From Swiss-Prot:
Residues 79-88 have a biased composition (Acidic residues). The gene is PTCD1. Mitochondrial protein implicated in negative regulation of leucine tRNA levels, as well as negative regulation of mitochondria-encoded proteins and COX activity. Also affects the 3'-processing of mitochondrial tRNAs. Abundant in testes, skeletal muscle and heart. Belongs to the PTCD1 family. Residues 681-692 have a biased composition (Basic and acidic residues). GO terms for biological process: mitochondrial translation; tRNA 3'-end processing. Gene3D superfamilies: Tetratricopeptide repeat domain (1.25.40.10). The keyword tRNA processing applies. This is Pentatricopeptide repeat-containing protein 1, mitochondrial.
């Protein structure tokens, strides 16, 4: 036996009886840990170093070395050596790490846990309300008062933070409805439907006012497509529940259809209103006129046809209806002149179409009479729908026979548009030479002379105003219906009358005649029209009149003056005057000056404008960039080697300055339409796309 194995026998071999003594503390007579027993140095055989062993283990080794069997000791020593190696493997890491268990994990779970910890740090637990406890009705009145003052953010914060989190009150249906109505005024679609979802989660039954506010917020939303989808889904849900809408809710739905859809959907809603037995009012036709205005090509003809239907049903138009008619004359066209002539200049045929069939039966009872009135109204609407969307081939009818086009029987055409009075833009046909001026007012079907058979060229707002009587005829028609013009009516008239005409000069006199207080928008309209004509001095002459009425020019006034600054000295003088008045020009003013300089191809003037814009650090928007990119392009036929062009000889200098100017100018950031209404703007990074996605009823 070699010395190594002999040393192992003395070091490892021990009887089983002494193994228990290793775990018994000799001093206190209690069990002790195997590694925490009493330790003392012991010299191992054939070793020059001392080892720290427990006291019981030392005794065990000394006794076992004397009375153990060699063969048994050999197997026991090998087994104990393997157990010690298994126990000591991996124990070195205990000094550096305390983790005992490792699991597989993904990065997103760590991000979620980190986000939860961050939210807990940023949003502490709200404190309980310690003041006087209020009622939900008190919060309803407070939110209603704040919304009337235009403080929607404060109303939302009062409801969500103080009422729900601090006082922890159970809200009522009216608390949600008043906030949804406030969101509807500003078009805050996402928040309105969020409140509607919270309302349903609390098992609160929405009222008619709630649905009216929801349809109204869809109508006022800046994103028309997503608002239309949300409104249609809400309407489908109400139809699935057989929920009967009242007239106000139908008006909100009709308003949504007018602003987000087209005239066909408006007529569908209008027919549903009649089918449900509701009595249509002037307000109902006002929303139909809104739907007509959405069609910029044929909306003016649509508006006239809807107007005649309203009169045929015995309804008196209001001042708002007249204002909407002026908007149609300003923004919309007449469409196909031949179709318009067939539909608007033949009142007798139209009356027979709109007239319901006469019954030869005896007078019926009240219920039957009501059903008859309902049927009559439906016939009127269906006849109107057929005429509104009439194709040109259907309106013209069969071709005219050849004998009707004999040269000897041809009748002269007289175009009356050339007269400065703008009474009509029509073509008159008569056996005798017709008068040059024809008084025409299409608002009254019977007022159209029988000699007028077709329209001439109707392209400008002044031409369309002439078809409804002109300035004086329009105001006289309002007087017949006992309506007085307001400042909006006169402002719209100032936009549609022809610039430089005598009617334009009468507008200031009409202010005093009807005792209407003028506002800055009215004078800005007059200043803009004179500036577009190039009459800058005439536009400046209105400033003393404006000051005489106690009004102060704003940025829009200076912007309208900038439209007429075609000469460099006028534009630079305007910028100097604004600087003296301590008014900083905005992007719109510089855009108007840039447009005036581009029209004259004056690159020196253009560089001066850009220098002033750079000095004032006015941010640049997309419109200005588009204007300057157009100015920096060479004309398609420009050839610098063919000849000298006096207008384009300085374009290279402008291109060099423009390239350097772009690198130092700030860009204008368009704010989100709902940013100012959010209670926590810094934590809400919703974009327009997210807003659209959040408006889907299924995901609320």
């Amino acid at each position: 036996m070699d010395f190594v194995r002999l040393a192992r026998l003395f070091a490892r071999a021990r009887p089983m009886g002494l193994f228990i003594l290793q775990h018994l503390d000799p001093c206190r007579a209690r069990w002790a840990g195997g590694r925490e027993g009493l330790m003392r140095p012991m010299w191992a055989p054939f070793s020059s170093s001392s080892s720290q062993l427990p006291l019981g283990q030392e005794r065990q080794e000394n006794t076992g070395s004397l009375g153990s069997d060699p063969s048994h000791s050999n197997s026991t020593a090998t087994q104990e050596e393997d157990e010690e190696e298994e126990e000591s493997f991996g124990t070195l890491s205990d000094k550096y790490s305390s983790r005992r268990l490792f699991r597989k994990s993904a990065a997103q779970f760590h991000n979620l846990r980190f986000g939860e910890r961050r939210d807990e740090q940023m949003e502490p637990e709200p404190k309980l309300w310690r003041g006087r406890r209020n009622t939900p009705y008190w919060y309803f009145l407070q939110c209603k008062h704040l919304i009337k003052e235009g403080k929607l953010v404060e109303a939302l914060d009062l409801f969500e933070r103080q009422m729900l989190k601090e006082e922890r009150l159970q809200p009522m249906e009216s608390n949600y409805t008043v906030l949804i109505g406030g969101c509807g005024r500003v078009g805050y679609l996402k928040k309105a439907f969020n409140l509607y979802n919270q309302m349903k989660k609390r098992d609160l039954e929405p009222s008619d006012a709630t649905y009216t506010a929801l349809f109204n917020v869809c109508a006022e939303s800046p994103w028309k497509d997503s608002a239309l989808q949300s409104a249609l889904k809400l309407r489908q849900q109400l139809q699935a529940k057989n929920f009967e809408l009242n007239l106000k809710t139908y008006h909100a739905l009709l308003k949504m259809a007018a602003k987000c859809a087209d005239l066909r959907m408006c007529l569908d809603v209008f027919k549903e209103i009649i089918h449900k037995g509701h009595v249509v009012t002037e307000e109902t036709f006002s929303f139909l006129l809104m739907g007509c205005i959405q069609d910029k090509k044929t909306g003016f003809r649509y508006a006239l046809q809807v107007w005649r239907l309203m009169l045929s049903l015995g309804l008196q138009p209001s001042r708002d209806s007249y204002n909407l008619l002026l908007v149609a004359a300003r923004d919309c066209g007449l469409g196909d002149p031949q179709v318009a002539s067939e539909l608007l200049l033949k009142p007798r045929e139209e009356a027979t179409v709109l007239q319901p069939p006469v019954s030869r039966q005896r007078p019926r009872r009240t219920a039957q009479a009501k059903a008859g009135n309902l049927m009559s109204a439906m016939l009127h609407v269906e006849a109107l729908e057929r005429q509104l969307f009439l194709e040109p081939s259907q309106a013209l009818g069969p071709p005219e026979p050849p004998e009707a086009r004999v040269p000897g029987k041809a009748q002269p055409e007289v175009d009356t548009k050339a007269e400065p009075s703008h009474t009509a833009a029509l073509t008159a046909v008569a056996l005798k030479p017709p008068p040059v001026e024809l008084e025409v007012n299409l608002l009254t079907p019977g007022a159209v002379p029988p000699t007028v058979v077709s329209f001439g060229t109707v392209t400008t707002p002044a031409d369309r105003l002439a078809l409804i009587g002109g300035l004086e005829g329009f105001l006289s028609k309002m007087a017949e219906h006992r309506q007085q013009p307001d400042i909006r009516t006169l402002t719209l008239l100032a936009e549609v009358v022809e610039s430089g005409s005598p009617a334009e000069s009468l507008l200031l006199a009409l202010l005093d005649e009807h005792q209407v207080e003028a506002d800055l928008t009215f004078f800005n309209t007059l200043v803009r029209k004179k500036s577009k004509l190039g009459d800058l001095e005439g536009a400046k002459a209105l400033l003393p009149v404006l000051a005489k009425r106690g009004l102060v020019p704003n940025l829009q006034t200076f912007c309208n003056l900038a439209i007429g600054c075609h000469r460099p000295k006028d534009g630079l003088q305007l910028l100097t005057d604004m600087k003296k008045s301590q008014v900083t020009p905005n992007t719109h003013i510089y855009s108007a000056l840039i447009n005036a300089a581009i029209r004259k191809l004056n690159y020196t003037y253009l560089i001066s404008i850009l220098k002033d814009m750079k000095q004032n650090r006015v941010p640049v928007n997309e419109v200005v960039i588009r204007q300057l990119e157009f100015a920096a392009q060479y004309p398609p036929t420009f050839d610098r080697y063919q000849g000298k062009n006096t207008y384009l000889e300085k374009i290279d200098g402008f291109r060099a300055y423009y390239k350097q100017w772009l690198t130092v100018m700030p860009a204008e950031e368009t704010p989100h339409p709902w940013q100012k209404f959010r209670t926590k703007p810094q934590g809400d990074q919703d974009t327009g796309k997210e807003a659209d996605d959040g408006c889907a009823l299924g995901g609320r």
